[in-house]
Amino acid sequence: MSHTVKIYDTCIGCTQCVRACPTDVLEMAPWDGCKAGQVASAPRTEDCVGCKRCESACPTDFLSVRVYLGSETTRSMGLGY
């Protein structure tokens, strides 16, 4: 099953999602757009098991990292008809 991992610009660079991921899908990448100077990225989405632990670990009010599971991806992004 294919999962989509999306990182939003509300990321504060706290690394909570990276530490929560059991399959090391996420990593931190340099980014000047936040105070921490880094942002989460998802270079290995093919390893995502869809557990959504990254979402649970995110401390921001609007989750900075979201995992969309299979058909959820098109529905959540407004692509389903």
Curated annotation (Swiss-Prot):
InterPro entries: 4Fe4S_Fe-S-bd (IPR017896), 4Fe4S_Fe_S_CS (IPR017900), PSI_iron-sulfur_center (IPR050157), PSI_PsaC (IPR017491)
Pfam family, any one: Fer4_7
Top-level taxonomic group: Eukaryota
Membrane topology of the entry: Peripheral membrane protein
Cofactor note: Binds 2 [4Fe-4S] clusters. Cluster 2 is most probably the spectroscopically characterized electron acceptor FA and cluster 1 is most probably FB.
Molecular function GO labels: 4 iron, 4 sulfur cluster binding; electron transfer activity; metal ion binding; oxidoreductase activity
Keyword terms, alphabetized: 4Fe-4S, Chloroplast, Electron transport, Iron, Iron-sulfur, Membrane, Metal-binding, Oxidoreductase, Photosynthesis, Photosystem I, Plastid, Repeat, Thylakoid, Transport
Cellular compartments annotated: Plastid, Chloroplast thylakoid membrane
Cofactor(s) the protein requires to work: [4Fe-4S] cluster
Primary site of residence: plastid
Cysteine pairings via disulfide bonds: none
Residue ranges the record marks as coiled coil: none
Enzyme Commission number, as recorded: 1.97.1.12
Enzyme type, top EC level: oxidoreductase
GO terms of biological process kind: photosynthetic electron transport in photosystem I
Ranges where the 4Fe-4S ferredoxin-type domain occurs: 2-31, 39-68
Function field: Apoprotein for the two 4Fe-4S centers FA and FB of photosystem I (PSI); essential for photochemical activity. FB is the terminal electron acceptor of PSI, donating electrons to ferredoxin. The C-terminus interacts with PsaA/B/D and helps assemble the protein into the PSI complex. Required for binding of PsaD and PsaE to PSI. PSI is a plastocyanin/cytochrome c6-ferredoxin oxidoreductase, converting photonic excitation into a charge separation, which transfers an electron from the donor P700 chlorophyll pair to the spectroscopically characterized acceptors A0, A1, FX, FA and FB in turn.
Assembly behavior: The eukaryotic PSI reaction center is composed of at least 11 subunits.
HAMAP family in UniProt: PSI_PsaC (MF_01303)
Record protein name field: Photosystem I iron-sulfur center
